[in-house]
Structures are given as C-alpha cells and as structure tokens.
Regions:
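Acidic, metal-coordinating catalytic segment for phosphate/diphosphate chemistry
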Residues: 1-12
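Conserved Nudix-box catalytic region and its N-terminal flanking loop in Nudix hydrolases
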Residues: 15-57
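Short acidic-hydrophobic surface loop/beta-edge motif
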Residues: 12-14, 72
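Conserved beta-strand and immediately adjacent loop positions that scaffold enzyme active sites
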Residues: 11, 19, 101
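Amphipathic alpha-helical surface "interface" segments used
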Residues: 140-150
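Surface loops and adjacent helix of pleckstrin homology
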Residues: 7, 25, 115
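A generic structural signal for short beta-strands and their flanking turns/coil linkers
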Residues: 8-10, 30-32, 64, 80-82
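Unchanged
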Residues: 41-126, 130, 135-136, 149
C-alpha cells in the first residue's frame, strides 16, 4: 500500500516593536518575493519546533512567546500551513541560505504587491487587524482555488 499524504508547512509571524519580520525568497517558487519565515515540517519534530527552526534557518531569528495563530488547508496542492505568532527576541535577524534579505515591516510599509503567497498576505492582514483590536484568535480556513499571479 502506498499513501500520498499532504505536506505540512510551519512558520512564524515574528514581531518586534509592532513590526513583522519578512524574508525575501532566494529560492523558487516565488524567488525574489517576500514571505514569512516558514517551510516544510521535518520528521520527528513538533509543529512548534518546525516553525522556530524554519525561522532560525531563514531569518537567523530567535523567537519567544510562541502561540498558534493561523491554520490554512490548501487541498488543491495537498498542503496545510500553520503559522505561530511570536516575539522576535532581540530584534536581530539576517538572511539565511534560503533568503536574499530580511526586514522588519510596519503595516504601511509592507510590499503588498510582492508577497509570495496568498496564505502570507491573509495572515499579515489578519495579524495587523488583530493587533489593532488587541485580540489574537486562532483562525482556521481553507483556500480551495489558485490565486492569480502577476
């Protein structure tokens, strides 16, 4: 028997002084576009461990106060995304091998037209809305269609 199971992508929404840390992708897909630090979960780790590992690998960033924030089911590509909201420990970050650069962004400065993936755009919009409201519910939803890309 052979099973083909979905892939789990884990990542963080690292925040420092009201700004969110983004990474400019150095690899395909969507090379040169901005994303949250995230990647495929590895065998033998929890989703939390995977999210913090990916944040270190892609942005050389240490995080604390890590809480589950967003889950997306993306059945048309057999993926599940899990993002954790967290604090960027000391504000320090730098590009890892899968990132061209890293940068902290206030909401008004985010390069919205250059965000790599729909799940990242939606997560960022929800984060800033939730931050303004002072309440961070865990959200679960599905994206069951391909977004149009320019």
């Amino acid at each position: 028997i052979h099973y083909s199971n979905p892939h789990i992508i884990v990542g963080c929404v690292p925040v420092f002084e009201g700004k969110v840390l983004l990474c400019k992708r150095a690899i395909e897909p969507r090379k040169g576009f901005w994303t949250l630090p995230a990647g495929f979960m590895e065998n033998g780790e929890t989703t939390l461990q995977g999210a913090t590992r990916e944040t270190w690998e892609e942005a050389k960033a240490r995080v604390t106060n890590v809480d589950l924030y967003r889950i997306f089911d993306v059945p048309y590509i057999s993926q599940v995304y899990m993002f954790y909201r967290c604090d960027l420990d000391d504000g320090e970050h730098s590009a890892g091998p899968e990132s061209l650069e890293t940068q902290l962004y206030a909401e008004a400065d985010i390069p919205w037209d250059n965000i790599a993936f729909q799940v990242v755009s939606e997560t960022l919009k929800e984060y800033f809305s939730d931050a303004a409201a002072g309440h961070f519910p865990v959200r679960v939803s599905a994206i069951d269609h391909r977004a149009k890309r320019s």
